[in-house]
Each structure stands twice: as structure tokens, then as C-alpha cells.
Amino acid sequence: MTIEFDSLFGDIGVDRFLAEYWQRKPLLIRQAIPGFESQIETNELAGLSLEEEVESRIILKEGSHPWELRQGPFPDDTYQQLPERDWTLLVQAVDQFVPEVADLLAQFRFLPSWRVDDIMISYATPGGGVGPHYDNYDVFLLQGHGKRRWRIGQQCSEDSPLLENPDLRILAEFDCQDEWVLEPGDMLYIPPGVAHDGVAETDCMTYSIGFRAPSHAEILVHFTDYLAHHLSDDQRYGDAGVNRPSDPAAIDPAAIDRLQQSVLRLVSDKEALATWFGRHMTEAKYPELAQAYACLLYTSPSPRD
């Protein structure tokens, strides 16, 4: 399946999308991929969730408590024991297991490849979803089969109130601003921080193409770790020409200035930053899966009797 980037966004086109929508506001694209058919069967997706190497979750709207989270891998009889509705299965990094799913990433090469995270696929029974929430990254939601109703809400932050839930970050307040039902081939773009809530109207499958957005904390921690690994133990704090302190128990401003200059000099090495960033952002999210794929056998339990 090959399409031009512009056709993915209909009349808007990729350039206008990047200028007006990317990281700014949601966009619904009807028939972004006309005639799209899911690249994986429901039973295959369920089979992946049984494997030790695969990150998977099941969320029940009404389980042992509201919005119960269950972590995979799951036993073989899991899907025979679930209710008829109001639950969803989520499987991460399906693109690392199924080449046909990975091929979808070619449609998003109008953005740098290092920004791509993975393709998560969710299967939901009627009423199933993960609750109203927001993400800190960009995501395209491509409908694989069935119908899902999406509500778009307010801009959120870490200060947005959440429900009391031990495992999930579900918004306590949701200000619905738009609402659409997506069918196969339809796609919804959600920028970071925008509240959204998807509920299955029929048995359905949704492809979530997520994009990496490293936090400043992640950048600082990993880059300084990289720098530290390449520094000689002989490179140390120095204070030649230091003046006699007025208070020996105090750390004087001059010491802080020298320390700051040392840190700034180290982190200002653009060549080192580029080398680290290239390695960090092109590392597979689940490097162990590359080997696991070669020996993984799909199991195909029926989601329900």
C-alpha cells in the first residue's frame, strides 16, 4: 500500500497540516487511507498478548473496580472469561512483530524517522475504552475495523485533576469540544496535552501511531550519563587563584560560578550532543523484540466464545 503524503490529509495537504495543526490542534481526516483493511486479525492480536516478550494490557470499564487494569502476558483462557462488552486490549509495538503493520510507517515519513515511537493496536468490545485522558506526545489514531466514537476535550497539564485510580491516569473532568465516529480508513490526529476519549460502538480495532517526545528530564539524565562515560577521571573541579574565604563553612558564589562554567562547557559540546542524540533516538523501544520475532509463534485464541 503506497499513497502520497498529501493524500493522507485530503484537501489540507501535508504542508498545511504541519504549519497549522502539528502540535497545535486536533484534525479529523475522513478516509485518510481509503479502503483500509486491518493488517492483523483480532485473534492474532490476542495471541500476541499471551507472549512474554510483548507489552500488553486489558482495561475493563467495570472490573473488580472501575477502570481495572490487567497486565500481560495473559493465560490462554483469558478471553473466554471476559464479559461480552466494556473492555479493551492494547498491544504495544505491534510494528516490531508484524511486517505488514510496520509498512504503515512509510505513510508518515513526512516527519523525521527518529520521531516515530511505535504502533500500538487496541481491540475493543462495544463500550470499551481506556477512559478520558491526555498524552504528552503526538498520536495519529487510524481506525482499522469497526466503529469508535471519539470525543475531544480541553488542553490539559500535570495540574489537571484525575480520578483516584491506582494504575491509570483518567481525567476527572472532561470538557467535550468535538465528537466524531470513526470508520475504517478514517484518522484522527491528537496533539500533546489534548484530552480525548474513545469508546467502541462496535467490536473495533484502532491503530495508534505515536511519536517520541523525550522529556527534558530524560534528555538531561541520558546525555549527562553519556558525557560522564566519556570523561577522564583526571578532569576535575579546579580553583587556581582562589581567594581566602571569609567563611570556611560557606560555598561562596565564585565556586558556584566556576562549577557552572564547567557544566556549561561540557553540555555545550554540540558534536557530543549530536552523537548521543542519534544513538538515543534511533534505539529500538524494545530491542529484545528483534530477536524474539524470529522465533515467535502466533497463538490464536478466540477473544470470546
What are these model-derived regions, one by one?
Residues 1-2, 295:
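Intrinsically disordered, low-complexity linkers and terminal tails enriched in Pro/Gly
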Residues 2-20, 33-186, 194-236, 241:
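Active-site region of the double-stranded beta-helix
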Residues 226-228, 232-265:
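Long, charge-rich alpha-helical interaction segments
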Residues 252-293:
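Anionic-ligand-binding alpha/beta catalytic cores of soluble enzymes and soluble regulatory domains
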Residues 298-305:
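Conserved small/polar residues in nucleotide/adenosyl-binding loops
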